[in-house]
């Protein structure tokens, strides 16, 4: 990892799944087409199995905090016993530039970030590569493949909703007809009741998450 010039900091992490695990900070340009505009640090979690093994890159759509857990391992990495590179999305948590100039938060910039990470890590992991993500991470997997079709060997988006706009318009008609009228009414009544009891229920949810070690 120290041989990768983009990495400015490396911290070891505990893992019950991998022989070695680290959180690293990878220097990225705000705009890959105009590097003179400045840089930011992107959090990348590296989980090692072997230099001769394939590598899964998780194209997270938001923050990477849950990937720090000693128990975390992405499904494909477990199935195929691969190394795992987990990339936090720019402008989330510890991958947020200062100042926050939102014009650089684009799908293309995110794909550029992933391309830079893959190019750097292929120097130590030369085997097959799989990209994968869930929900917005699934979108990110698809967009990464769109901008850089040759970076990975396989792309596996677990759910990849592509919205038509800020107001998509497809969700409401679907929700109005899915299931039976009685089932829809029960769900609506439950949701309203939970909102009415938010002040009482939220502390219980938080206590449960703390006791279970959920993040």
Identify the residue ranges that each predicted region occupies:
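Catalytic-loop region of hydrolases
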Residues: 1-83
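Structural recognition of the beta-strand scaffold that forms the well-ordered cores
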Residues: 55-58, 84-87, 130-132, 154-157
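Alpha/beta-hydrolase active-site loop signature
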Residues: 63, 89-93, 162, 179
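Conserved alpha/beta-hydrolase
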Residues: 77-96
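Alpha/beta-hydrolase active-site loop
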Residues: 104-123
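Alpha/beta-hydrolase fold nucleophile elbow
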Residues: 125-135
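Gly/Ala-rich beta-loop-alpha elbow adjacent to hydrolase catalytic centers
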Residues: 133-137, 141, 145
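Alpha/beta-hydrolase
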Residues: 143-215
